[in-house]
């Protein structure tokens, strides 16, 4: 009985194997029922292509790095939205409606909360918030936020502007190129702006801002003085009548010679809005005054005036010249000539005193006519502030000589005519007696 049961099992097993071989498919799942096999069953090797590929599900905090082609919130007035002219073709990607709504609502309310690594992929990265411009890490003063647009100087680079009703940017954040007047109350706040061409405020130039400090050339080593060179002074040195080139300007500013010294100087000037083309030729002849900055030239003129006022031997020169013209017949004529010369010198010094040429940080309003003022300004620009004060000091020394010469002539006349002195005393005594009566 047991032998027949064993034969039936073997016979059924052979039929199963034969059927599997004839049908062309392996009956592997049925073999797994036999406990004698040491191997486990394997899944069927088959691949069914699926046209609708579903991306894996991500939780809501995940932000898709690809831009969405369709925006359900396009009707919202977003100040950071791009103009249609700047839009780029974007690939079509299927999205999840529920997840996109939560993401778009989060982007509208927390636009600044995006991860730092996604900021470079945002096509709107060139548009910045005006709060960041006024209070961001640019070194801007707190008082700059209250400045109106007319209180800011012009910018070097213009921001391209495209009319778009979707862009709503306040006027206070737009900097336009053009001459703008600076008020005294806002000059300190504007001068605190760092000059950097890469930033939005890179073109802001304050003429009174210090460009650099230059050590004096005429001072002793024991008392070296430094003079501040403003942006306005550099602009005057690059403008007519001097028109300095990069080499001469570098020497005036005491910059060390290097291989790329001219290029670095031009780049530094370009940041403050001054253009210095390469290969430029100077317009004026180089003199010793060319090496002086305005501060040192004015200092030299002031010291020269002090020396002329205190040390010039006006009295000794007047007495010496009067002895050479001691003829009594010439004294009256000579005295009239001295008086006329003194009057001419006074008119000349009064004219120079009305000179209002720009110098240093000052640009006073002109008093003289434009024709004569332009000539005086030309002379002042060539001498860098030394010319007019030095001429006034020299003419003042001449006036002191004329005054001493008139005094010496009066003494000489009285010494040569003692009777006239007694007659004058008698006349004065008679007048006093009549006044007493």
UniProtKB/Swiss-Prot annotation:
Residue positions where Phosphoserine is found in the record: 239
Covalent cross-link Glycyl lysine isopeptide (Lys-Gly) (interchain with G-Cter in SUMO) as placed by the record, residue numbers: 10
Record GO terms (molecular function): DNA-binding transcription activator activity, RNA polymerase II-specific; DNA-binding transcription factor activity, RNA polymerase II-specific; DNA-binding transcription repressor activity, RNA polymerase II-specific; RNA polymerase II cis-regulatory region sequence-specific DNA binding; RNA polymerase II transcription regulatory region sequence-specific DNA binding
Pfam families attached to this UniProt entry: TF_AP-2
Disulphide bridges: none
Domain notes: The PPxY motif mediates interaction with WWOX.
Protein name: Transcription factor AP-2-alpha
